Amino acid sequence: MPDELRAEKSFPSKPYDSLKNKSEFDRVYQKGFKKHNPFFSLFVLDLSKEPPKEKEGFKDPLSCRLKDKKTLYLLGLSVSKKVGNAVKRNLIKRRLRSLTLKHAALCQGLALVFVPRSDCYHLDFWALEKHFLEMLTSIKNYMNKALKGLKKGITHTYAKQ
């Protein structure tokens, strides 16, 4: 096929990569910070502050994927069948992906996992965005507070080592 007839890419590449397997989700659940509201739970792991774990020839998959210049953050969506049928679940996933794309600068260097609840479907996009921004800024403030405590040598209940 001649080069003149080839279509150019019409969509820009997405700034996130998805969490792929159970071990990646479990790492965010166990080591990350979490926040809950009646509509969804948000788990956040700051990968920029965490040193990559390297064993014999094994590289940390989460940290390595962020070193790629096109990938700003990692996103995981865990939508249960209790939330609704496939149409409802997919609508929620599209909205959450769109939210993270819209606020990609806030999500930079993070691994995010969303766990929506059944009431999440009844929210419109703007209400969902409001709850997402409140939770994300609260978690980021919490993480900064914990990091400052660790630098000073103070171990609080919110500071993870």
UniProtKB/Swiss-Prot annotation:
Enzyme Commission code: 3.1.26.5
InterPro entries the UniProt entry points to: Ribosomal_Su5_D2-typ_SF, Ribsml_uS5_D2-typ_fold_subgr, RNase_P, RNase_P_CS
Catalytic activity, reaction form: Endonucleolytic cleavage of RNA, removing 5'-extranucleotides from tRNA precursor
Record carries keyword Nucleus: no
Any one Gene Ontology molecular-function term assigned to this protein's record: ribonuclease P activity
GO cellular component, one term: ribonuclease P complex
Keywords, alphabetical: Endonuclease, Hydrolase, Nuclease, RNA-binding, tRNA processing
Pfam families named in the record: Ribonuclease_P
Transmembrane segments: none
Tree of life domain: Bacteria
Top enzyme category: hydrolase
Gene Ontology biological process terms, A to Z: tRNA 5'-leader removal
Complexes and interactors: Consists of a catalytic RNA component (M1 or rnpB) and a protein subunit.
Role, per record: RNaseP catalyzes the removal of the 5'-leader sequence from pre-tRNA to produce the mature 5'-terminus. It can also cleave other RNA substrates such as 4.5S RNA. The protein component plays an auxiliary but essential role in vivo by binding to the 5'-leader sequence and broadening the substrate specificity of the ribozyme.
Family: Belongs to the RnpA family.
Name of the protein: Ribonuclease P protein component
Organism ancestry: Bacteria, Pseudomonadati, Campylobacterota, Epsilonproteobacteria, Campylobacterales
